[in-house]
Amino acid sequence: MSYFPWLTIIVVFPISAGSSIFFLPHRGNKVVRWYTICICLLELLLTTYAFCYHFQLDDPLIQLEEDYKWINILDFHWRLGIDGLSIGPTLLTGFITTLATLAAWPVTRDSQLFHFLMLAMYSGQIGSFSSRDLLLFFIMWELELIPVYLLLSMWGGKKRLYSATKFILYTAGGSIFLLMGVPGMGLYGSNEPTLNLETSANRSYPAALEIIFYFGFFIAYAVKSPIIPLHTWLPDTHGEAHYSTCMLLAGILLKMGAYGLVRINMELLPHAHSIFSPWLMIVGTIQIIYAASTSPGQPNFKKRIAYSSVSHMGFTIIGIASITDMGLNGAILQIISHGFIGAALFFLAGTSYDRIGLVYLDEMGGIAIPMPKIFTMFSSFSMASLALPGMSGFFAELVVFFGIITSTKYLLMPKILITFVMAIGMILTPIYSLSMLRQMFYGYKLFNVTNSYFVDSGPRELFVSICIFLPVIGIGIYPDFVLSLSVEKIEAILSNYLHKSFS
């Protein structure tokens, strides 16, 4: 038990400090922007300090643990803790949110509310990754839905209200299943209800009940991840949202579903996970092919990038379904890797849109010469997305491949078939990535457009791009930087899983 409440401060600080934005003097938007960036930087430094000096990498147990009784009648505790599974996504959240606030610099309309909503999302996302109580996990899971809805409906494109409504219907609909499952697990088999994750993990449930719980939780995570066929909100949301919101969606929000799948479904419901994992493997494989095949047909380049996110999340699902330490480590590496790459692609898509005012690829062409910096960064991140060796995407997908091949759960022929289909998906990725680059940056089309605002990337935009590009290269060259965070915890999860599923 931690004596100093590091995690409570880390979770509460963004939203509480963000509340005082409304009391700042109305002297333009610069004060609000700098205040928000300072909060994000301070939060990131605080998180990094706490994890560097108070987190032991070789300890698979929960660390920095805090437990405060909150609502007695429900046995509801403010229970927080960090382990190897959650430290990576938590640091990713801090990094991407800080850069997203810098990316949101051009936002001038209602900037106080805009920046407050971004900070509220920050608290909700870190709270989700560090919760050790099922009800607290659900509250934090829901906390970031309202900010996304408002950010989308107030600062989105022409169809923003349609996209925002679709987003809230899908995510709130999925959360109903989460809400039903949480008290069900808490109340089952005990005179005193408990929502503690550790206590729930040590319980055993009847097979039929475990399958019902698993399926309910899975629907909630399938919407958020997203997993087909519950993915259709994502292209519409990305197509209309402001690019700083897209960075948070692609970089962090989608990863919460995959995290919940391991944290709740695999750790708490191992028998059901053993039954569902072959189906997860099939769904993940179909998802890679389906999204990679659908992406080239999207005329809107933001929707094309959104479908690439759906395809890449298929690798994460397959890694989780492989039930091997290599597959799970690959899934976590893919979560971190795609968090950087997805956020960068949407940021660059947004900066391109700011300049040319076009989203349809058939109207674009020839912007490489007037905007060489944007072209260079867009090309670099597209290469990372198609898993070029030396970049983070390559190693993440390679580790997932080896995870399937070394899995003892599946027979040889299904493993060969799945790896073959995954390989086809990896071949399809360059097709939509490179064709998007060709349509946007090559040719002469836009040279004929009069009064075009052709200004290349400024220092702020270049800084954001380089800040994301460095970890993409760093992880590609030295993936142990990320794998060392989770390897001990993954071993512990698998040993507990195998012990419980065969007992």
From Swiss-Prot:
Gene Ontology molecular-function annotations: NADH dehydrogenase (ubiquinone) activity; ubiquinone binding
Top-tier EC class: translocase
Spans through the membrane: 4-24, 37-57, 87-107, 134-154, 167-187, 208-228, 242-262, 272-292, 305-325, 330-350, 386-406, 416-436, 462-482
An example Gene Ontology biological process: electron transport coupled proton transport
Chief site of localization: plastid
Record-linked InterPro entries: NADH_Q_OxRdtase_chain4, NADH_Q_OxRdtase_chainM/4, NADH_UbQ_OxRdtase, ND/Mrp_TM
Annotated membrane topology: Multi-pass membrane protein
Catalysis: reaction(s): a plastoquinone + NADH + (n+1) H(+)(in) = a plastoquinol + NAD(+) + n H(+)(out); a plastoquinone + NADPH + (n+1) H(+)(in) = a plastoquinol + NADP(+) + n H(+)(out)
Entry's family note: Belongs to the complex I subunit 4 family.
Protein name (database record): NAD(P)H-quinone oxidoreductase chain 4, chloroplastic
Designated gene of the protein: ndhD
